[in-house]
Regions:
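ATP-binding glycine-rich loop module of kinase domains
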Residues: 2-83
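Protein kinase-like catalytic core scaffold
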Residues: 42, 86, 98, 161-164
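Conserved protein kinase catalytic core
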Residues: 51-52, 107, 170-172
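Conserved structural core of kinase catalytic domains
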Residues: 67, 79-126
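Catalytic-loop of the protein kinase fold
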Residues: 134-155
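C-lobe/activation-segment region of protein kinase-like
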Residues: 156-251
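Regulatory extensions flanking the kinase catalytic core
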Residues: 246-263
């Protein structure tokens, strides 16, 4: 895969950790890695490494590669979360990276962008699945961080599979008390899950940048939930009334309307 923007800028390409060029299709690119289509049924997440392509078509690794994430933290998290329903199936590590099952239906963000409003029951199923998968992460002492529509893939049966734990925090299983790390807390994970719930109900993507408690959005920074099903629950969550995903789930499950046919 070559990157070439202007004639005077050297061509660069993605490389594996052994220096060989990445020749497979790159499906996605995050801050720390590439997702490549490794086989019909698998993808491989590899460190984000580049090389300059020299005039004789040999390659020279970029010096910035020394700062690349080696994915060992994410590997430990996928190992901790193995078997958790709703997490992308982790198939182990190779010399190149992390092997995961391929989900050909794309992300919930793509689905929202490209499809009309789904039936009420489908959206409710997604909402409860999403809360459950991230609550299970918290129960396994994983502080997730990157909770977004783009990181929720759709399996063949349209159930959810969560990916991207590159920035997540792994805490000792025997540890008790609040999950928190450098100002980021489990409540901020609740905020980002709530933004996804709003997005699915309004069928319009909404997200905020919030990585510290003091960046929590105020009422002017979030959309109105008037006339939105479960709008009062979302408004309560945005005003920090739920400390855990379990609390949020209980309230949603108990106040879930049968559903406007297509709201």
């Amino acid at each position: 895969m070559l990157y070439h923007h202007h004639d005077h800028i050297p061509i660069t390409c993605a490389i594996h950790s052994d220096g060989s060029r990445v020749t497979q299709k790159i499906l996605g690119m995050g801050l720390d890695g590439f997702i490549i289509h490794n086989s019909p049924s698998t993808v491989l997440k590899i460190p984000k490494l580049y090389a300059r392509v020299l005039p004789d078509w040999t390659t020279e690794p970029e010096s910035e590669n020394q700062y690349a994430n080696d994915l060992s933290g994410e590997k430990a998290i996928y190992e901790r979360l193995q078997g958790v329903p709703g997490v992308a199936k982790y198939l182990g590590a190779t010399k190149d990276g992390l092997l995961l099952q391929y989900y050909g239906n794309g992300s919930l963000e793509d689905h929202l962008k490209n499809n009309p409003l789904p039936e009420w029951q489908q959206r409710m199923d997604w909402i409860l699945l999403i809360i459950d998968v991230y609550a299970a992460c918290h129960a396994k002492r994983v502080l997730v961080f990157d909770i977004a529509l783009r990181n929720l893939l759709l399996a063949d049966d349209l159930t959810i599979r969560a990916i991207d734990f590159a920035n997540s925090g792994l805490h000792p299983l025997e540890e008790t008390g609040e999950l928190k790390e450098e100002g980021y807390t489990a409540m901020i994970d609740v905020l980002h899950v709530t933004n996804i719930i709003y997005s699915l109900l309004a069928w319009k993507k909404f997200q905020v940048d919030c990585v510290q408690e003091d960046e929590w959005p105020d009422a002017e920074q979030v959309p109105s939930t008037v006339d939105l099903p479960l709008g009062d629950v979302i408004a309560k969550s945005w005003s920090r009334q739920f400390k855990t995903l379990d609390e949020l789930r209980d309230v949603i499950a108990s106040s879930m309307p049968e559903g406007p046919a297509n709201t």
